[in-house]
Amino acid sequence: MSRQTPTTALALDDAGLLQADGTALKLPPKERAVLRLLLARAPGVVRKDEFAAQAWAGREMSDESLARCISRVRQLLQPRGVQVEAVYGLGYRLVDQAAPVPAAPSAQALDSHAHARQLMQQRTPAAMGLAIELLRDLVRESPSFGPARVALGDALAIAVGWGHLATPAAVAEGLAALDGLDAGLPGLHAVRGALLDMAWRFDEARRSFELALAADPDGTDTLLGFARHLLYTDDAAGAVARLRRVRELAPHALHVRMTLTRALVQGGHGAEAVAEAQATVRDNPGQLLTLAFSLAIQSMVAPQPELEAAALRLTQGLDTPPFVWTVASFVLSRLGRREATLDIVDTALLCSRTTAGEAALYAAPLAALGEHDRAAALLRAAVDERCGMMAMVLRDPAHAHWLPQHPAGRALLHDVFGEASLA
């Protein structure tokens, strides 16, 4: 005698074994335990801590390992007309695939989503933080509004890339937001790829971007995300080719032009990178970010004495952003101004509230001064915290000459990129 669940294709027999249409299911232990919990609770929600306590038997369970397990259970259940639905912020539950179509988002939800996207376009930490909070509220209030969940994943990936959020928690939140969405939803695969890149799961990210490109080969966000993936995986030439196409499609997007400039340097096209950076400044007068970025690129490619005065002028504002001090210290280091460089670096690290990821940006000026051990220590602290931004930082051309030659540098490359990075 078996006990039938609300999802009638599945059942538990008297011995507690799983059956589908009268046939016993053969599953690995974790998947079997997860599905048993879902069946026992159906149609209710199983919380994540319940999975950890029973399926993981009290051992540590990461959000990512649970998500992978759920994905395998989904593959098993889909042909049987049953799906595992993610309930944002709570857990998972079993539902029949013939569930009612959710109601369309309200006008207020659409307006909140549009506002969050506008904030994200500002590309500032404050605006991105506000966008994330707005999207979190929106997803809680309208969990069936797929574009809002995609936008939340996108915003979290961007914030992680800047070093402003703890990577493991943010990536897990972003992947959970995408969980269970229609595979055809615009931007879904590209955002998942960006999140996986921040978790250093580059092979999985590559597969996500392949799906994204198949669905939207000329989408600017898709191409930009894939280009970044290529930079992380040390294919600067491939990244430059994609970014040139994105620049054609979105010629005025600052983040596109800055990423192209960075890719040109990484690919060995220094003079072209300087020209692109200077053109971006001319096309966007008064932008502190583009000016600072241009000075950093010029000092990396061809340091000139006149760059010092320009860099120091950036620091004279009443409320100088942290990135200005990073750029100023790098410019000074490339000009051999050791004492002035260390004054900025030491002050920033000792007297400012910086995350491990933000502190790692000072490794570049230290490396330029030959302080490789100290630079490696900053990078190691960020890698040990699994800061997603390190995928880009360790590919910085400022580190290309010393990281592969330094014992600590080789260990860093291995920990983030794997054995292939040392070949």
Model-found features: residue ranges?
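Conserved structural position within tetratricopeptide repeats
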Residues: 139-140, 179-183, 213-214, 245-248, ...
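DNA-binding patch around the recognition helix
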Residues: 2-12, 25-26, 38-39, 61, ...
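Structural signature of tandem alpha-helical TPR/SEL1-like repeats
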Residues: 127-133, 162-177, 199-211, 233-245, ...
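Amphipathic helix-loop-helix modules that constitute alpha-helical solenoid scaffolds
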Residues: 96-136, 140, 150-173, 420
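Short amphipathic alpha-helical recognition elements used for nucleic-acid or partner binding
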Residues: 23-55
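Specific register positions within alpha-helical solenoid repeats of the TPR/Sel1-like families, i.e.
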Residues: 120-121, 157, 161-164, 197, ...
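Alpha-helical protein-protein interaction modules
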Residues: 240-242, 253-423
